[in-house]
Amino acid sequence: LVIGLAYESQLWGAIFAPFIIGLIADRYFDAEKILALIHILGGGLLFMCSIALGFDKFYPYILIYMILYMPTLALVNSIAFRQMKDPSKEFPKIRVWGTVGWIVAGLVISYGVGWETSQTLEYTFYLSAIVSVSLGLFSFTLPKTPPKATNESPSLREILGLDALMLLKDSRYLVFFISSILICIPLAFYYQDANLFLNELGMENAAGVMTLGQISEALFILLLPLFLNKYGIKKTLIVGMLAWSLRYVLFAFGDTGSNIWMLIFGIVLHGICYDFFFVSGQIYTDYKAGEKYKSAAQGLIALATYGVGMLIGFRLAGRITDM
């Protein structure tokens, strides 16, 4: 249950994200400076996580960290989209480097330093703290992304980032929004338990093997503009959802014996699953939001996915893991 509670902390970050973004990034301060400050503060909190003794002391630090971290998911998208003329073609070429970072982290932890199984997991927080501070300092070098100038006094609705809720009046976007919540319920199981599941099955260097999913993600994100251009956003999202369903079937029947190919294929499917649903969904949200509420809209979809959907998923995953 404590594992579920730890992962669930990102829910509260996702809830606060639209408020932080709607109040600050869309109105008052340069987005890249907010991003820098959050990552630097986050580095300090991650260091405190590494030295915390017991879950009672660990949880407050990870909770505050996630409240600060979750808005960055929308902020980086907002900063990127503001610099682009055609996000559907340009964004995947930028987003792919986040995937490269994920691959490097998995390989370093699994094959490089062996922190995955050597009872030295606190070192991952040391490394994360250093990287977070470094990312914060680097964020100051990002292109200047000021809020859109306006002479109007903000309403409470605008301050809370609630204007992005107008997107839900569009029935097609509402379907996408609800689908995002639903698909993130089983996704929470994958995020929380996939590595534990593979290790319990006896797969060696599970974290390293799981980087195949990120390699796949890097390849498919580069193909995403071609797919979007040829088939459109609707078919792209449907393919992404179908890939998630197939993936869980493969994990259900896979093992480290003759059916190990099912586990490997399920991991490799991550590229289609993530890029064709989540990345294309971010592009779709940016397109539907209009110029004024781009950051708040990204916060809204973060609330649906990393907030509501993941909350339900982590609650269920935590209880099932404890059974």
Where are these regions (language model features)?
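Intracellular juxtamembrane helix-capping segments at the cytosolic ends
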Residues: 70-85, 276-290
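Juxtamembrane intracellular "pre-TM" segments in multi-pass secondary transporters
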Residues: 142-178
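Structural signature of the two symmetry-related core transmembrane helices
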Residues: 33-47, 235-250
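Helix-loop boundary and gating motifs at the non-cytosolic
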Residues: 1-14, 172-211, 278
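Helix-to-loop junctions at the C-terminal end of transmembrane segments
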Residues: 16-30, 113-114, 219-233, 321-322
